[in-house]
A protein has these predicted regions:
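Conserved acidic/glycine
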Residues: 1-31, 151-152, 156-157, 178, ...
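Acidic-glycine-rich active-site phosphate/pyrophosphate-binding loop
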Residues: 1-10, 43-45, 82-104, 379-393, ...
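A short, small-residue-rich loop immediately preceding and capping a beta-strand
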Residues: 20, 56-57, 108-111, 141-159, ...
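Cofactor-binding active-site loop characterized by glycine-rich and histidine/acidic residues
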Residues: 30-172, 385-386, 414, 418
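Short, surface-exposed connector motifs at secondary-structure boundaries
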Residues: 51, 147-148, 208-211, 421-427, ...
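A glycine-rich helix N-cap at a beta->alpha junction
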Residues: 78-88, 171-182, 205-209, 446-461, ...
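Short glycine-enriched loops at secondary-structure junctions
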Residues: 89-95, 375-381, 388, 406-409, ...
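Thiamine diphosphate
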Residues: 91-103, 121, 127, 131-135, ...
Length: 658
């Protein structure tokens, strides 16, 4: 029966790809046996309860092979992937897009496609399982004991982010992470040996992984035995499964020609004959459905029923802990976070917003029991350490400080995996200039609606001596162009607390909080509440103003000083703090026009970064004072002076150009 079911996976994938005239049949045909073995003999899922917190997680890191996953989900009885949806593969509005999308199709545990990120995301899922198990499991009550499985390809293994995350997983000894490596020696451009020649298992052993070789990837039983062996390891496991890409296609198997193009009518006919498949396209025999029902759906429903009974008994035995867990899983715990949760500085005091952020992190940690995070080897520079907790590792599983190492990209993908798993709220920090290293993962945070909080410090040329390699210029503009994300650049400690509060109240997108190294004064009129509007009046001496200064972050205090200087010559100035462009854009037309009246054309923006965005607010007849060249190495005050961000220089520029 197993071979017939394996062939059904292959044929269903080939048929859907042919119908779409687009897709990647090679991985479907080559990896079908290992995927069948995993789904029918190991994977613990309930198609009727796709959000079961203790289900096994499955990540198809080789996301281009999406029809492999859709075939499995359809055959296993996941309602979102009906036969009609399989036929609509890669079509507008379907549940079967070109690459798997979390939240779009029930049964998909992660959005994948950008190679390498699936492996890395799975590391985060495994970390979440270990953390929650250590925190909530009690003797006889293993509420959290699931595995995280991955199918990846050569392209994933080549990607640097997979190396970063695999190294991290080994340090953390995430032994419930099992990666099935579809090793077929072919990539899109040809044979992998032309670009990729290392011994992958030796590499992973050097990281500290357990490794297993399956020489015959067509053997369901060999893969099954390897997974059984992996489950006994005290390390994460890489199972290298030697396969033939496009297996069964007489003229194209084993070649790059079957990687990313439909087989077509003629080759499909030969393929069907080769494997002895006589059914019409999309006609799956009843005994195949019965096989998957018995070995995936029914088995999974049985496992879920046992877990439900266990959870009910747990609630009776540990009612307070169960109540906390339910609040965490439903995100109801966020409701306990309020303005009163935070501490505030007095007007006239000064504090770097990175330090204000540290205060906020610890305020949030005091309220949310599963809130944790870390930094890419910069915790004492980013100020991301949760006080009273130590480093989280295999021996200290419930501590709340994660040392990600110098692995920005992996850090962000691990954060995504943690949030995809559920039951935690997480953050990660690095220098703002290094946000470029992780932007691919931040983009997937946004695409998957994941409320990850990114902490970016050292936000401008005020970094000073470290020079242009460490001084962000284009980075604010770049982050602001990513859809479905909030970017905050707070002006002082008050706005920083608000940014953290709003980041935790947000459940459908990531937040980037961009912070200073240098001290900033606590402003007289900065407002915790008004940050939610994205922009608000922070200084004004006359309702009859004729000039608007718009600023963010450290430049808000500068703008207020500039306003006072301009007023000496008769100008009447409104200063607007705009900590979040995205939140401001969500406001009503009336609020926007009230804040930035259309009849006031004397407008200036101040931000130590790329100036392009600001013409939207100051107009072509306004003045956008920014930095559109790289920074320099010198003491911070000298760099700031040379780049014209002093009261005198800004006032002179306004007078000369407006």
């Amino acid at each position: 029966m197993s071979q017939k079911s394996v062939n059904a996976i292959k044929v269903l994938g080939v048929d859907a790809i042919n119908k779409a005239k687009s897709g990647h049949p090679g991985v479907v045909m080559g990896a079908a046996p290992m995927a069948y073995s995993l789904f029918t003999k190991h994977l613990r899922v309930n198609p009727k309860k796709t959000d079961w917190i203790n289900r096994d997680r499955f990540v198809l890191s080789a996301g281009h092979g999406s029809m492999l996953l859709y075939s499995l989900l359809h055959l296993s009885g996941f309602e979102d992937v009906s036969l009609e949806e399989v036929k609509n593969f890669r079509q507008w509005g379907s549940k079967t897009p070109g690459h798997p999308e979390f939240g779009h199709t029930k049964g998909i545990d992660a959005t994948t496609g950008p190679l390498g990120q699936g492996i890395s995301t799975a590391v985060g899922m495994a970390l979440a399982e270990r953390y929650l198990a250590a925190k909530y499991n009690k003797e006889g009550y293993d509420l959290f004991d699931h595995y995280t499985y991955v199918i990846c390809g050569d392209g994933d293994i080549m990607e640097g982010v997979a190396s970063e995350a695999s190294s991290f997983a080994a340090v953390q000894k995430l032994n419930k992470l099992v990666v099935l490596y579809d090793s077929n020696d072919i990539c899109l451009d040809g044979e992998t040996k032309d670009a990729f020649s290392e011994n992958v298992r030796a590499r992973y052993e050097a990281y500290g992984w357990n490794t297993i070789l399956v020489e015959d990837g067509a053997s369901v039983e060999a893969v099954n035995a390897a997974i059984e062996q992996a489950k006994k390891s005290d390390k994460p496991t890489l199972i290298e499964v030697k396969t033939i890409i496009g297996a069964g296609s007489p003229n194209r198997q084993g070649t790059n020609g079957v990687h990313g193009a439909p087989l077509g009518e003629e080759e499909t006919a030969l393929f069907r004959k080769e494997i002895g498949w006589e059914n019409e396209p999309f006609d799956i025999p009843a005994d195949v459905y019965a096989d998957f029902k018995a070995n995936v759906a029914d088995r999974g429903e049985g496992e879920y029923a046992k877990w439900e009974k266990l959870y009910a008994d747990y609630k009776a035995a540990y009612p307070e802990l169960a109540k906390e867990l339910e609040e965490v899983l439903s995100r109801e715990d966020i409701k306990r976070l309020s303005k009163e949760s935070f501490s505030f500085k007095n007007v006239g005091e000064a504090q770097a917003t990175r330090n204000s952020s540290q205060d906020a992190i610890n305020s949030v940690a005091a309220v949310l029991p599963t809130f944790f995070g870390g930094s890419a080897d910069l915790s004492h520079s980013n100020m991301t350490f949760i006080k009273g907790d130590n480093l989280q590792d295999d021996a200290h599983r419930t501590e709340r400080n994660v040392q990600f190492g110098v692995r920005e990209f992996a850090m962000a993908t691990v954060l995504n995996g943690l949030m995809l798993h559920g039951g935690v709220r997480v953050f990660g920090g690095t220098f703002f200039v290094f946000s470029d290293y992780l932007k691919g993962a931040l983009r997937l945070s946004a695409l998957q609606n994941l409320p990850v909080t990114y902490v970016f410090t050292h936000d401008s040329i005020a970094v000073g001596e470290d020079g242009p390699t460490h001084e962000p210029i284009e980075h604010l503009a770049s982050l602001r162009t990513i859809p479905n994300t909030y970017v905050f650049r707070p002006a002082d400690a008050t706005e920083t607390q608000a940014a953290w509060y709003l980041s935790q109240k947000t459940n459908d997108r990531p937040t980037s909080i961009v912070l200073t190294r240098q001290n900033l004064p606590i402003l007289e009129n900065s407002s915790f509440e008004k940050v939610a509007k994205g922009a608000y009046v922070v200084y004004e001496t006359s309702a009859d103003f004729d000039t608007i200064l718009i600023a963010t972050g450290s430049e808000v205090a500068l703008a207020i000083d500039v306003a006072r200087e301009l007023e000496k010559d008769g100008s009447k100035v409104r200063v607007v703090s705009m900590p979040s462009v995205e939140l401001f854009e969500e406001q009503s037309k009336e609020y926007k026009e009230e804040l930035l009246p259309l009849n006031i054309r004397r407008r200036v923006s101040l931000e130590m970064g790329n100036s392009a965005l600001w013409y939207k607010y100051v107009g072509l007849d306004g003045l956008a004072i920014g930095i559109d060249k790289f920074g320099a190495s010198a003491p911070a005050n000298k760099v700031i002076e040379e780049y014209g961000f002093t009261v005198e220089a800004v006032v002179e520029k306004i007078k000369n150009e407006l």
